[in-house]
Amino acid sequence: MACGLVVLGQLDTKMKIIFVRHGEPDYRELEERSYTGFGMDLAPLSEKGRQQAQELWQNPLLQSANLLVTSAVTRALETAFYVSCATGLPLRVEPLLHEWQVYESGIDRFEEARTLFLENKGELLSNSPIQYETATEMKSRFLECMAKYRDYQTVVVVTHRMLMRQFVPD
């Protein structure tokens, strides 16, 4: 689980974003039932992930926050729930804060797409064997989503690694 602070100037504001990666998920039940694609997004946190989320409120960065915004994906939503309960921060759920999109199914294809994404610095080459969301598309999706919160000074955003890394180092 990671935390990182970013000041966004792109929204005509100096909004501070505290990025939080969701806790560790437990995919076992979904894998046993052969779920794929967005079905895997139903995975809850593992015991370790719940513990990570419950301890997160102690991070001093969170003390300056005014709002908690989360991806609608279960592992992020469950992480945000624990933080909201512990801090009393109001919680908003945003479907546009979802995981990076790969337009083909299967874990092997996902890993191949991630490798291509990193090798090509977030660009999608015209001859790419796999179609995926580019870094520019992810940034645009995030900024569009967060524009409605521009009046908040500091916002905690619980989301996913590939989206976070467009704004903070991995």
Predicted features by range, described:
Residues 8-16, 92, 98-112, 151, ...:
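Acidic, low-complexity terminal tails and accessory targeting/binding regions
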Residues 11-12, 61-64, 148-152:
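Flexible, charged surface loops at secondary-structure boundaries
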Residues 16-92:
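Active-site-proximal alpha-helix that buttresses catalytic centers in soluble enzyme cores
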Residues 24, 74, 97, 162-163:
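Catalytic metal-binding/acid-base residues of hydrolase active sites
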Residues 27, 77, 140-170:
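Active-site-adjacent alpha-helix immediately C-terminal to a catalytic or transition-state-stabilizing loop
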Residues 39, 43-44, 85-141:
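Phosphate-handling substructures
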Residues 53-58, 138, 144-145:
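A short, well-structured juxtamembrane/interface segment
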